[in-house]
Amino acid sequence: MTDPISDMLTRIRNAGRALLPAVEMPHSRMKENLANILKKEGYVAEVSVEAGMPKKLKLKLKYQGKKSVIEGLRRISKPGLRHYVGATEIPRVLSGMGVSVISTPEGVMTGTEARKKNLGGELLCYVW
């Protein structure tokens, strides 16, 4: 697999459309950090790491009635074309209704947190 983050976002998108209660994927620290941001922002109900070889990352999805809380996910920086932004260039997603996720030297964080800390980095994805 050439892009594990895109694979993660696609699994979440497909599980949400199929109204599945949870989704599993191979574990990595980057994916776990991204999942914890989704949980903190209220897009995912629960994040857990299942032991074993190989480790699995399990996300419990949130729904409002019969509709997923996550309306859209979009990968920005890809392996073939990286997208870096400075602290002043961090975009707002849907006028603040969504979240941009950025990988900075201090770790993975939302665009709002990176702006407050005056950090730039690789723009991973948008979630709304």
Region annotations inferred by a language model:
Residues 1-128:
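Core subunits and conserved enzymes of cellular information-processing
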